[in-house]
A protein has these predicted regions:
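Short loop segments at secondary-structure junctions
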Residues: 2-4, 11, 75-80, 94-96, ...
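The catalytic Nudix box helix
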Residues: 21-54, 72
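N-terminal strand-loop-strand
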Residues: 1-20, 48, 52
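Active-site-adjacent beta-strand/loop module that shapes the phosphate/pyrophosphate-binding cleft
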Residues: 59-85, 90, 106-118
Length: 146
């Protein structure tokens, strides 16, 4: 659906209650891309198609917990988005992203993903409060002149 993004309302685990993209831990023996596809299958009962990596984000929490997040996009999917015990599927108009119901960092980098920009980011959190961030955004590609 053009201009629409398939996200989830997370029902359990870290970030429960928030709107986010499907995702989770990479299992032993998986690549991050394989893990992203498996998580979409588990959380939404869909298989992403045309998957590409958009970014790698690093999160540090003041309690010492840290994680590395590989962000992927897909051009399509197979299956029907279905509610599971982990997530409720939500179609969101990309011009009306519900940032107030998402992690605080999302408003900084989701627009870059939607624009197809390449970037990396580092974020510092104290529980759900973002204390700091650093984004490195690659320059936009020049359009060829004819």
């Amino acid at each position: 659906m053009d201009g629409m993004v398939l996200l989830i309302r997370k029902l359990m685990g870290m970030g429960a209650g928030l709107i986010n993209a499907p995702g989770g831990r990479v299992d032993p023996g998986e690549t991050p891309e394989q893990g992203a596809i498996r998580e979409a299958q588990e959380e939404l009962r869909v298989t992403p198609v045309g998957v590409r990596e958009a970014s790698v984000l690093a999160f540090q929490f003041v309690d010492g917990y840290s994680l590395r997040c590989h962000v992927y996009t897909a051009t399509s999917y197979e299956g029907v988005p279905t509610e599971t015990i982990e997530a409720i599927p939500l179609w969101i108009d990309e011009r009306e992203m519900p940032y107030g119901q998402m992690w605080a960092d999302d408003r900084l980098w989701y627009p870059l993903v939607l624009q197809g920009r390449k970037f990396s980011g580092r974020f510092l959190f104290d529980e759900g409060i973002m204390l700091g961030c650093e984004l490195d955004v690659e320059p936009a590609a020049e359009k060829a002149k004819s």
